[in-house]
Structure formats: C-alpha cells, structure tokens
Swiss-Prot record:
It catalyses: isochorismate + 2-oxoglutarate + H(+) = 5-enolpyruvoyl-6-hydroxy-2-succinyl-cyclohex-3-ene-1-carboxylate + CO2. Catalyzes the thiamine diphosphate-dependent decarboxylation of 2-oxoglutarate and the subsequent addition of the resulting succinic semialdehyde-thiamine pyrophosphate anion to isochorismate to yield 2-succinyl-5-enolpyruvyl-6-hydroxy-3-cyclohexene-1-carboxylate (SEPHCHC). Pathway: Quinol/quinone metabolism; 1,4-dihydroxy-2-naphthoate biosynthesis; 1,4-dihydroxy-2-naphthoate from chorismate: step 2/7; Quinol/quinone metabolism; menaquinone biosynthesis. Binds 1 thiamine pyrophosphate per subunit. The gene is menD. Its EC number is 2.2.1.9. Transmembrane segments: none annotated. One of its GO terms (biological process) is menaquinone biosynthetic process. Pfam families: TPP_enzyme_C (PF02775), TPP_enzyme_M_2 (PF16582), TPP_enzyme_N (PF02776). This is 2-succinyl-5-enolpyruvyl-6-hydroxy-3-cyclohexene-1-carboxylate synthase. Belongs to the TPP enzyme family. MenD subfamily. It is an enzyme of class 2 (transferase). Homodimer.
Length: 584
C-alpha cells in the first residue's frame, strides 16, 4: 500500500511539476473522485493557479478563454466517464481556432475496463481528430525511469499543442485506489527532474529568396491588389500589414478579429465597411483585383467570402504558418508556409514603393461614403442592434476588450465596429462558430483582459447560464450586454424567415425568460435599459466597477430586420450613385 502511494505521489508530482516548468501554470479543475491525486497535487504546487468549475462543459470553455487571452497553454482536468465527454465542444472549438489546451482525464485502471465497473467508459482517443495528439499515460510506478517518462511525455505533449497550428492535446491517466497522495514525502516535486527542461523550440520558416524575388517582381506589376486580414493571434500584425499596404498601395480589408481596425497604428489603408458595400452588384461586377493576399482565418463577412469566390482570374495567396489550406472559397493559387510577420517583413524589405493609385482611392472613397450612411443609425431612437456595437465602443476605455458572441453580435461587430484610435481588442469563438460556452469563454478571458464587455444574444446567454458561476467563485470582473430579441434573431435574415407557418416554432424559438433572477442568484447586478443614454451609462459603469454586471437591451426581431434592410438599401443607393458618377 505504501509503495503504491509513494509511486502515485512521485509519478504524478513529476508530471505536475513539469507542467509548471514548461509555463503551463493555469488549470481549470472539475471536481471528481478519480482525478483526486492530480487535483490535490496541482492545488499544492506553488507554481500552479487553480480554478474550480463544477460544470465540465462550461469548464472547458472557461479554460479556452484563459488560453485565448494568455496565448499559451492551459490545463483542464476532470474525472472519468461522461465528465470527460462534456469537454468535447470546447475541445472542438480549440482545435479549429488553434488554441492550445492540455486536456487531462482521469480513468479507471485497465482491470476495471469493459467489465461493467461504475463510471468507466472507453476514453481512448475520446476526442478523435479534434486533438493534435493523444496519449494513454502509464500507471504510476516507483522508478526513476517512470518519473523521467512522466516528464518527457509532458514535454512532448506541450510541444505538440504549441507547434503550428496550435491546438488541444489529450492525456488520459489511469489510476488505482487509494487516490490520496502523500505530501510528507521528501523532494515531492524533484523526481525525474534533470538540470535542463526539454523544450521544443519552433523556429521561423524562412521563405526562399527566389520565391520572394519572384513575388516582388509579380506584385510590382499588379496595381489592383487587396490585403485581407482575418482572425489572427499575432499582436504585431497591424504594424506589419499596414507597412506592406503602404509599400504596395493595396487596401487592407480588416476583419474585426484581426484587431487592425483599432489601435495607435496608422489606419489610412484600412477598409472597415466592406461587409456592407460588397453587397452592391455593380461594384462586384466592375471591381476586379489582380491579386489577393490573405492572412489569418477566413473573415466573418459572407459578402467578402462571396466576393473572393468570384475572383477566379486573380492570384490568391494564402499565408499560413502551418501550411494548412484554410481556403473555403476554393480559389487559392498559392499557399505560403510562413508566419504573417515573416512574409510581410520579406516583402517590405524588397518591395519598391508603389504609388497610391485610383484603385486604392476607389476603395477608400466608397468606404467613407458607406460609413457616413451607416452612421445615420446613431440617430435612431429605437433599439437597433447595430447601434449596440457603436455605443459600446464609444464608452469603452483604452485597452478594453470587446467579446462578440456568435450569431448576430459578431456580424453586427463586423458591420458597425468602425476604425478607432482607441486600443480595443476584439475576441470571439470563430473556430466552429457555436453559440455554446460563450459566457464561459469570455469569463476565462476576463482574468487577463480587464475590462471586458461581452455582447451576446438571449439564446446564447441561456445556453451557458451555468458559466456565470465562475464569475462568483473567482470574483471576476465582466460586463455582459444581453441583446434580448426573445429568440434566434439571425434566422430573420435567412431564407427560413419566409416559411411563416413554422418559423417561430422551429427558428424564431422565443423562450420568454426573465434573466434578472438568474443574474442575482450568481451575485451579479442586472439592469434592463430604456434608451441609449441609459445604455451607455450602464455599460460604462460596468466596465469601471468590479464584479458581474448584466445589461439587458430588449429589441424586436422584425423591427431590427427592417432597420438593417433599410440601412443596407440606402447604402446601396449611395454606392451605386457614386460608382455611376465615377464612370462618367
């Protein structure tokens, strides 16, 4: 018995210690029995920050949020059985959004598998193709070789999570009872520890000089180019992309998640209203780029994606450090395996300065005309969902974070988050674009990003109500703006809206909940606003005071649809008139 406890303590102690040596210092723990030894050791280790979350689905997204904000791996621990299965949605999102998670699941030992033991199921490769690597850890054993094995496996798995493309990995730990480690053991954290920690260093991919010279030569003869920046984790991309745009004369179509629309950098070349004006048929038929250079994930804008698809005669260059083909438009002609920074730097160094021509001035002119028209909605007294975004940005302080939920909030952010000299970070879950786990992801991010304002629809809010517990348990600061249109507002913009007979029951899905009671149950403050002045006051108050603050603004789905369509129609008229004037 003592030999078992000693082996358990030293073996798992070596594993936990190696996590911290490799800078994995945050773990989200869901309580359970079989995971007891790992949980206790993590709580005991002075280098580990532990966060408790009793709902595994919310816990997974909470860890995801911390990892997204810190831009480094975060561990996630649960017991055996369906607890592990509840991590699945967050693991899928982490995989597709390239966020490193270290998923740790406790398990029954081999003799208790497939024999009807309680809380035992097959956890081998549980997450399938949605993790970069899976390993079944050996049972604890008291030997130097096994202590070293625990550390080396940790090193390999973290390296896998961090190498491009980043993503989740899964370690499954079978353990036998008794499960309580012995903290009185001498040198508990030192077993298997060498003088040096094995770390896999990722170098920069160097583009062949022949390719760079060839590309510079080609681009020098292509006046009509576009730089498209999607969701990106590189904080320096704004400076490099704008320098490249200045050299080439190509406008930057900046997705809000690129974080190029706001900040202290020069935004002369940044186009922010393309989602609206690329709906114009005359423009789409007459504006034909020679080359498109795309960084990061695919943009949120459907109008931009459709525009990209139609450019079948253009050169399409997709820059991706992992070399993966993120090209749902199916038009890429070249995929460059290099970091965005390395690619931009190479071109900036060798590209001659190309004069800003009529091509850039056309994009800039139409962008400004579009923005002028869109800003008319700031005079609307009615509860227009697009104005939610502009009014939040108006009152957010320097250095704040705006987290946009999926469905309508991220689309309104795309349409109405205009360029700003304030440094405002925009975040979202755009891996698989689900509405689950949004509250938890934002709360995880709020540990690092303070102040943080989450904009979320009422159905998405309902979907992750359990996530609010983290705000109470860990005394987190967050302001949540609930845009309550009593249902799935996005479906009003889709063809399903025309099927009136079944629309409300299948797609509109009103649930008629009063969220005030839930918010107060979790120790938060709740306000239901009437009017834009009160809305701005409540958001500003929430962003500057501690705790959980929920601000609800009620909107009407049909009215919101009409306002969007009216604004789009007016914008299209302005654009068409402007284009026809230029052609005379």
């Amino acid at each position: 018995m003592n030999n078992h406890i000693e082996a358990l303590s030293y073996y798992l102690g070596a594993f936990v210690d190696e996590l911290t040596r490799l800078n994995v210092c945050d773990v989200v723990i869901s309580p359970g029995s079989r995971s007891t030894p790992i949980a206790l050791l993590m709580e005991q280790h002075e280098g580990m920050n532990t966060y408790l979350h009793v709902d595994e689905r919310s816990a997974g997204f909470f860890a995801l949020g911390i990892a997204k904000a810190k831009k480094r791996p975060v561990a996630l621990l649960c017991t055996s059985g369906t607890a592990a299965a509840n991590y699945y949605p967050a693991v899928c999102e982490a995989f597709h959004s390239r966020v490193p998670l270290i998923v740790l699941t406790a398990d029954r030992p081999h003799e208790l598998r497939d024999v009807g033991a309680p809380q035992a199921m097959n956890q081998f490769n549980l997450y399938g193709t949605f993790v970069k690597q899976f390993t079944e850890m050996a049972l604890p054993e008291a030997s130097e070789a096994m202590y070293h094995y625990a550390r080396m496996t940790t090193q390999r798995m973290i390296a896998s999570a961090c190498l491009a493309p980043q993503g989740p990995v899964h370690l499954n730990f079978p353990v036998r009872e008794p499960l309580i480690p012995d903290f009185s053991l001498e040198s508990l954290w030192d077993k298997g520890r060498g003088e040096y920690t094995g770390v896999v260093q990722q170098g920069n991919v160097v583009m062949p000089s022949e390719y760079v010279d060839s590309l510079v030569g080609r681009l020098s003869h292509m006046e009509k180019g576009l730089i498209i920046c999607g969701d990106d984790s590189h904080s320096e991309i704004a400076a490099f992309a704008t320098q490249l745009a200045e050299k080439t004369g190509y406008p930057i179509l900046a997705d809000p998640l690129s974080n190029i629309r706001s900040g202290h950098h020069d935004k002369t070349m940044v186009i922010d209203c393309y989602d609206t004006f690329l709906r114009n048929e005359l423009l789409k038929e007459t504006w034909k780029p020679d080359v498109l250079i795309r960084f990061g994930g695919m943009p949120v804008s459907k109008a931009l994606t459709q525009f990209i698809k139609k450019q079948t005669k253009a050169v399409h260059i997709v820059v991706d450090e992992s070399g993966q083909w993120r090209d749902p438009a199916l038009v890429a002609t070249e995929v460059v395996q290099a970091s965005d920074i390395a690619f931009c730097s190479a071109l900036i160094e060798k590209m001659p300065v190309m004069k800003k021509n009529d091509w850039f001035r056309m994009w800039q002119h139409i962008n400004e005309k579009t923005k002028e028209t869109l800003r008319e909605m700031e005079t609307y007294d009615t509860a227009f969902e697009g104005r939610v975004i502009t009014d939040i940005v108006r009152v957010l302080p320097e250095g704040a974070t705006l987290f946009a939920s999926n469905s309508m909030p991220i689309r309104d952010t795309d349409s109405f988050f205009f360029t700003s000299d304030k440094n405002i970070q925009v975040m979202a879950n755009r891996g698989v674009n689900g509405i689950d786990g949004i509250i938890s992801t934002a709360l995880g991010a709020s540990i690092i990003c303070d102040p943080l304002v989450l904009v979320i629809g009422d159905l998405s809010f309902y979907h992750d109500l359990n996530g609010l517990l983290a705000a109470k348990l860990h005394e987190l600061n967050i302001t949540i703006v609930v845009v309550n249109n009593d249902g799935g507002g996005i479906f009003s913009f889709l063809p399903q809206y025309e099927k009136k007979e079944h629309f409300e029951s299948l797609f509109g899905t009103p649930i008629g909940l009063d969220y005030e009671h839930v918010v107060t149950m979790y120790g938060g403050s709740f306000s239901r606003v009437n009017g834009w002045e009160q809305f701005r006051e409540e958001v500003q108050k929430g962003a500057t005071t501690e705790g959980l603050h929920v601000v609800e603004i009620c909107t009407n789905r049909d009215e919101n649809l009409t306002l969007h369509r009216t604004l789009w129609a007016k914008t299209q008229d302005v654009i068409t008139t402007s284009l026809q004037g230029e052609s005379k």
